[in-house]
Amino acid sequence: MIRVGITGNTGCLGMMLAARIRGNRETNLIAFERSWFNEPEMLQHFVAHCDWIIHFAAISRDGDGERLYQTNMRLLEQLLAAVTTTQFSGVVALASTTRYAGKLPYHKSKRDGAALLLKTATENAFRSSVLLFENAFAPGGLPDYNSVVSTFCANIAAGIECKIDSDAQLTLLSAAEQMDQLMEKILAGNIPVTMTFKGAVHLSVSELKEKLEIMRTAILNKQIPRFETRFEYELYTTLRAYCAGLTD
């Protein structure tokens, strides 16, 4: 039985991964509470019962950039202190982003966090991985926060016109697909030092809007479109969650 602990298990990605771990006979989800970051003994107890630790806990937005950076670094430092104290020998995987090279404090916290994780792993003989997630979307995402997909889905479901200020190119991959790929690594017992996720789709903002509008029409007509790719299926599933009640 592979014992997996998830920090940030109440977030979109954390909840999705937790559901997969609970539903697999080969894995056991180790309970975690965010308050344990401030309780060293509880955090050590958590770490001691894990074979894998997936560290999602972080904040991605805050009006105070320095506070965001310090919070994200502090959470990782507290986790690594428990890892060191318990002589943990499993895998610690840090959730990051393909856009880690950006200039925002969030991006800096991911860069510095990755460097700290690798240094600590090298000094303490546990395995580490940095998970470079693509721009993810899923049912339950927060509009104007998690993803442009969440924002567009909420607006289109409500019949609100989506304004496009810049028809930029997007790189999207559903949270479900990324969690499936991460589960494969956990079950295989092997993960690269830096993990990227396959299957991302590239499209413009206007193309995304057009796809969602076509899907909304299908939902209102109680039709299920033919999906050419899993991306289209996951996009439809996400929009449908925002359209709940429209077809009653």
Give residue ranges: language-model regions.
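N-terminal Rossmann NAD(P)H-binding glycine-rich loop of SDR-like oxidoreductase domains
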Residues: 2-21
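Short-chain dehydrogenase/reductase
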Residues: 69-70, 103-114, 142-146, 172
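Mid/C-terminal beta-alpha module of Rossmann-like enzyme folds, strongest
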Residues: 177, 181-248
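NAD(P)-dependent short-chain dehydrogenase/reductase
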Residues: 118-128, 134-170, 175-187, 211
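A short beta-strand-loop structural module common to alpha/beta enzyme folds
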Residues: 28-37
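NAD(P)H-binding glycine-rich loop region in Rossmannoid oxidoreductase-like domains
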Residues: 36-78, 82-85, 97-103
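Conserved Rossmann-fold NAD(P)-dependent oxidoreductase catalytic core, especially the SDR/UDP-sugar
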Residues: 74-115, 119-124, 128-131
